[in-house]
Amino acid sequence: MGVDVLTTSNNHSMDTGYNGLINTIEKLDELGFAHTGTFKSQEDKDSILIKDVNGVKIAFLSYTYGTNGIPVPKGKEYCINLIDKDLIKEHLQKAKELDPDLICVSMHWGVEYRTKQNTEQENLADFLFENGADIILGSHPHVLEPMEKRTITLEDGTTKEGFLIYSLGNFCSAQKDKYTKDSIILNLQITKHADGKVTLDSYNYTPIYMQDNGAGAKDRYQIIDLNKSIKEYENGNSDISKNWYNTYVTELKNITDIMGEETNKTSNIEGDYKVSFIFL
C-alpha cells in the first residue's frame, strides 16, 4: 500500500488497555513502521519522529482529544499524547530545535459526522501554526471536513505557508452513515530549492469511495478511485452497473461539495516531491 508513517494517538488507543497499546507498538516495530502518538516510555515520548522524504526532513507529531473515558494508568501518562497546549508547545519547540524542513501535526479532534469544523478546531489550528506547525492533518469525525492553504504571520513579522485539513474522512471502514464512505488521498507538492528553502507549492486530492459488495462477496469491501471509475464507465471501458455508476457520481459530488471541485485531482502533481496522506 505504500504507507511509511503511522500516527497512533486516537480515542481508541486505550480500548484494550495499556497492554493492548504496548502490543500495538511492538507489532508496528516488528513490521518496520515508523510511528508516533503512543509510546512505551517517557524517553520514546520525548523523541521527535523525523523522516527524510527525498531529501526533505519532516517532523511528525500526533495528539488526541481523549481515550473514550478509559483512564490512562497512573504513572504511565507518557504512553499517549493527549491534546494539551503546554505539551504541544513543548514538542513543537523540540521539533524546531532539530531543524526539520517541515513539521506535520496530526490532530484527532472535532465532532463525529459533521462536515464542518468547529471553533475549537479553528482555535487549535491557529495555535499550532503560531507555534511552528507547517502541516495539520485532522481525523476523528469519520467524514471529510474542509482544507485550506494559508499564509501565517509569525511574531517577528515574517510569513510562511501552511496547510490544514480539518478531517481526512474514513479511508477504510464499514460505516454506513451519509458521507462516511467518502474520503480522499491528500497530495501535497513540496519543493526543496537549491538554497535549501522548502515550499509547499500546491495540493490536490484523489476522491475515493468505500464500496460494500455485500456479505456474500469474495471481496466485500473495495476502495474505489471515483475519478478513474467514472471516466472508465463513461468511455465504455467498465463492466460496473448503472446503479454503481450513479452511486459514484453522487458520492463524488458529496466530496467536491465539501472539499472543492478545483482541487479534485485530474492528473498527477508535477514537481520535485509529493507526499500523500490518508486516515485509516
Predicted regions and their residues:
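Acidic, metal/ion-coordinating pockets
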Residues: 1-280
